[in-house]
Amino acid sequence: MARIAGVNIPNHQHTVIGLTAIFGIGTTRANKICQTTGVAIDKKVKDLTDADLEKLRDEVGKFITEGDLRREVTMSIKRLMDLGCYRGVRHRKGLPVRGQRTKTNARTRKGPRKSGVQLKK
């Protein structure tokens, strides 16, 4: 297994697919990285030479990935919540942030249904 940006990339995968295992690198960025380093897209990770891996590590190192990116996203959400703006309030309440309807749907964000109002006996 090759180790790039602190992530073990499976040997049996193609280089492009393997790079997407790194948080912050999707298919478009993985294609761009392979293109700039000159590594074949359809080459398996186990077939990469040490020189190829070093090129990939250097290119991936230019981007914000993994822990730094996760921290940045978390801090961005925390900043919104501290500001008390609409988006921050929605994050705090655990509701959809981007204007989706909540009368029906939004179950992923709201969690499982609470039991309904019970009648007095």
UniProtKB/Swiss-Prot annotation:
GO terms for biological process: translation. Gene3D superfamilies: 1.10.8.50, 30s ribosomal protein s13, domain 2 (4.10.910.10). It comes from the Bacteria. Keywords: Ribonucleoprotein, Ribosomal protein, RNA-binding, rRNA-binding, tRNA-binding. Residues 92-121 are annotated as: Disordered. GO terms for cellular component: cytosol; small ribosomal subunit. It holds the Pfam family Ribosomal_S13. One of its GO terms (molecular function) is tRNA binding. Located at the top of the head of the 30S subunit, it contacts several helices of the 16S rRNA. In the 70S ribosome it contacts the 23S rRNA (bridge B1a) and protein L5 of the 50S subunit (bridge B1b), connecting the 2 subunits; these bridges are implicated in subunit movement. Contacts the tRNAs in the A and P-sites. Belongs to the universal ribosomal protein uS13 family. Part of the 30S ribosomal subunit. Forms a loose heterodimer with protein S19. Forms two bridges to the 50S subunit in the 70S ribosome. NCBIfam families: uS13_bact (TIGR03631). This is Small ribosomal subunit protein uS13. The lineage of its organism: Bacteria, Pseudomonadati, Pseudomonadota, Betaproteobacteria, Burkholderiales.
